[in-house]
Amino acid sequence: VMCGRCINIIANMWNSPEKAEWKTGALGIGSSEACMLGGVAAWLRWRAKRKAEGKPFDKPNLVMSSAFQVVWEKFCQLWQIEMRTVPLTLEKPTLDPKDALAMCDENTICIVPIAGVTWTGLNDDIEALDRELDAYNKKTGYDIPIHVDAASGGFILPFLNPEVKWDFRLKWVWSISTSGHKYGLVYPGLGWVVWKDKKYLPEEMSFSVNYLGANITQVGLNFSRPAAQILGQYYNFIRLGFDGYKEVQQNSMDVACYCHEQIGKMKCFENYSKELQNPLFIWYMNPEYDK
């Protein structure tokens, strides 16, 4: 029950339109398992559609930026999916929607933008991607969806930038994953994935078993898992509430902004980005400094 309540809270935080008493989602050992569950769902949906149309389904691909978290490489390796990555540069430090769509075709199971890139701290422009993707899908007749990897940003954007549209308010965002043990403020390991509606979670991903006299239905790659992290997440939600989380995240952002500003004043360093979107940023040695 506590797990279901956590999923409901997170789904509402991400503006889920689902009207069910229990929102559609699952927990994982970390955001890595949550990413995999979102990816598997996208792959199974694509495969079912291709089978129904009598088309080949042996060459699926996935599109995302070169700043991907390593779990996506593992996911593609395990499920034999081609990974197509859009290079990032200083001129294009986040996923460019047009470049991403140029890599898509009828075999693309989904596009994966990132909210809170782990090695830059930036967010991909998911609203712009959704807009471009909508036009692309209408033109081609495809139904390529978006899975948002919000391992970091999933617990930052709702509190600090609620006006930014990156979540289920967007048409093609069908699933989102996040980490409970990053800005969710729980000890490792805990991850969450939520789908926009139950219809986006393939039935074959639900596994039912009679265990110790009780019927258990779960969606996950692991079976045995500790419950302590779920208790921790639920406790934090109830204890801190929205305002409490907002205060914690704002404090983290204030500290990051101070460090970003001070490092930016040092002649020997350059900040990778002038803007700060998450309590995370990187800097590098000024190439002119040694000269």
Predicted regions mapped to residue ranges:
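Predominant activation on well-ordered alpha-helical scaffold segments within soluble catalytic domains
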Residues: 3-8, 36-43, 73, 127-130, ...
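Inter-helical turn/loop segments and adjacent helix faces that build the functional surface
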Residues: 17-20, 47-56, 243-247
